[in-house]
Amino acid sequence: MEYSYYKIDPTGNITAIVETLAERNKQSRIAGLIMAADTTIEQVGFLEKPQGEAAVRLQMMGGEFCGNASISAAALMACKSGIDSGNITLEVSGADEPLCVKVQKLCDNTFLGTVAMPLPVGIETASFGSLKLPVVRFPGISHVICDSSLSVSDAETNIRSWCEELQADALGLMFLDGDRLKPYVYVRSTDTAVWESSCASGSTACAAYLAAKAGASQTVALQNPRGELRIKAELIDGALCSLLLTGSAEIMGKHLICT
């Protein structure tokens, strides 16, 4: 069977969005074929019929949540609908509620997207051997905020076992150095670990952590390896109440994969 998909560049985190309806039990295999055929693709999402009144449902390859893919899907829906500016509502795997993405066309096939990200279900400190590191838990994915105390080789060695320890569907190790971020993400169901060019949920996790640590609202611009993501984390009476992520997405082209 042939499956059509769009290759999209959201701040360098190259994403495939499959528009042909695919059964859930086939999605991991299809994602693997797409990523093997084009090694620049870092993740795959599938468009499905929404359960509610959203424009579409985005189901990620491992059932995880992804902010960059959400902006990508919203940009694709806007482009296909001829919308230059407006709001696109999505259902997204790993998110308990529909997400509203505000899109604005920048030029042909490129959109700026701002999305109200899900709030973390918890921010805590976890022990990993001799290391004690902050963990920001979202529905569908958890992120560990790392510094130079964790080596790259140790990250690559331990990410799978740490994901299991945290009982997470997916795990990001976010190497944060000032305003620079280097994300490493593992998805349990597909057993894939990728040094991503940018990570929206990981950037959001860092902003949430920094705001909680400061006890005050924060607006941060994080330089991911291939672009900047801006996040506004708002606190009211010391409680995190809003996370707004802004990034761009370029629709690069449409492709086919045969299974």
Task: List where the protein language model places each region.
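Membrane helix-loop-helix hairpins that form the core translocation module of multi-pass transporters
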Residues: T110-P118
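Short solvent-exposed strand/turn elements
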Residues: P118-E124
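A glycine-rich beta-to-alpha transition motif near the start of alpha/beta enzyme domains, typified by
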Residues: M1-F111, T125-S127, P134-R137, S142-T259
